[in-house]
Amino acid sequence: VLAKTARGLLCIKQALPRLKVAQEWYAPVERNQAEVAWLRVATQIAPDCVPRVLGVDEQTKSFAMAYLDPAAYPVWKEQLRDGVIEPQTACMVAERLAAIHRATSGRPDLAEHFANDDTFYALRLESYFVATARAHPDVAAALHGLVKTTSANKHALVHGDVSPKNILAGPRGPVFLDAECAWYGDPAFDLAFCLNHLLLKCVWRP
């Protein structure tokens, strides 16, 4: 939600128990806390890669963050849709993700703080891989194996939703949004998730 205050505009985000998708899909509202925590870690590593967190309300499971004007921070997905293809944006997305993964690797403190296994499984592994395995039994064994491997790997802090719709092409490089699925696990997930979305965008712009 965009809020107007005496000091200017800001964004307020609240976690809802039911996600805004066509099918009935529920998720724990604690994912809001994971997002704030990820933003705070990421800004220490690459200060320009996330919006600034302005305040948190634990009771309502909401937080306020800096408003980034779309004129200066267009959504990367919309750029790709419109044929604005900047390879440098993709390079900087990879560089910033790598910096976050590298800086958070081998951190027992972060592993404990981001032990959001149940949320990550529900929002990412079950909803994508397990659901696909049910619909396509011929590849079920491979998908279940991938779920098992991904769940077992605990190497670095993972964003969990790195797609062009959650990335702003800012003047100082890409800005990551929507880290509700943040989890300490397999950083390969972030890379594969983003590459999958980029491959799908090729349908728009071969």
Regions found by a protein language model. Name each.
Residues 99-149:
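Active-site catalytic-loop/activation-segment of kinase and kinase-like phosphoryl-transfer enzymes
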Residues 14, 67, 116-117, 179:
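Residues immediately flanking
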Residues 19-20, 72, 167, 184-186, ...:
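Conserved protein kinase catalytic core
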Residues 37, 188-206:
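Active-site activation/catalytic loop segments of kinase-like enzymes and analogous catalytic loops
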Residues 97, 101, 159, 197:
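Histidine-centered active-site/metal-ligand motif
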Residues 4-108:
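ATP-binding pocket architecture of kinase catalytic cores
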Residues 1-12, 144-191:
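Active-site acidic catalytic loop and adjacent metal/ATP-binding pocket
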Residues 1-10, 55, 87-90, 114-120, ...:
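Short intrinsically disordered, low-complexity coil segments enriched in acidic
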